[in-house]
């Protein structure tokens, strides 16, 4: 989990001719400077206001939308900025954070001015991430200077590190993807490109199969560990998009990658004291979309080819419903647009907890939105884009498997990992449900957890459960530590879901596994460090809020004495789950496909056991 503490560049006040400028220079030269200077690493460590970042990001995206959204469209009519909104918005967020950090430095704030870039530095780069596939793109500091108007005659669009990355290739099975015309007709087409999607959607498709409703599950995962398992029975057809569609790379026709306005006067947007050129942002976005970063960040050319294949599939299968568990990232937004064009109803099932301040794009495009808990209704209502959208509180189909978990078997698995059961082994075991944060962030979280475990009464052990998208090697440095507490890393194929039922406590920052632990009545410690965003479980009295190691130790001591059960109302706020969410979603799909069901045929809150709009149990629909 180690990461370099050095910064390659620094910022120094200098002059070009008679004009004072802030120049990016090699960090080593700062030691001899008498003028105001700072390393870029120090700049990036300056605190910025989250709300201010979000507000400016929204302003920049609105400006870019007006300036450029129709410069490129798919053959099906989807704007490039609609489909690629999430990766572009994330890039803009990095830019805005750096601009606000620059303004937060007192020396620059006292004398703001133009920034001169570092020659030959790429304009786009990568941040450190523990994710196995996801690429954490960023705007370099030279890219920041470029966005503000600096000339970049000798700067490549991509950094050397980014240029060295090869296009991710899907597993070999995708090379034998069926032609759309070979797929039989079905009532529902579902799309998945991660294991969480598959775990959310497959239970629904299996329930539909029991009702005699055939479906097609399209697997778009480019990471072998994220592929869909082969469905049982013959009512669910599993197919994949062709290899060349998912890995295509190339320029974006219509976007100005090689040409720009001489002064950028045709479009600018303000970020505090900084004037950002929209033509430069368009060029940065075009460079970002040239390369394919897998199913989560497909190139523009990959998007166009996937759309063509998917529209052919819809024409052959003729479904009444397209089922998704993400309709905002590129493939999800594309599928929602294609489904609407085809005339199919769109249903999105929330597959993970929402943190309103941290969502990549606060938008939902589907006709029907299935959310987990009562607290998810308000953000869903704010984010819906469909003019006839309905919101349904039906829990989480992926959680239905919790009812059959073997607690004793999972507890034995944890004990075996830690060598528990002997005199020197731990008396109790905590599971840390990890997420693919950057190395420094994970290290800071680990320090608090381990210190808290050491301070707690009794002997606690820790099992680190990697996120499905996370590489296991990131934890090697932690495991080299000597002494207490005893630690181990769960098999990535097991993950937190495969062992949390056997834990004495679960530690989480914002993992959905924290919600699963609440539903299983396993005590949850919600790590609430400065700079981290949590699921807010503690706000509903569903978890112990832990800001420091002392808080962690105190919470573990409460667990040792026997924590009180989480009230039903608190559970429902987080996830209204009764063990049959998949059946409820399946019934929603069936009912909404029937032409005689009026859109006002809503489902109200009802006590358990009472008759409901869904024969399978409770639920609520909000328009």
Q: What name fits each language-model region?
A:
Residues 1-623:
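Catalytic-core helical/loop segments in enzymes performing group transfer/polymerization on anionic/lipid-linked
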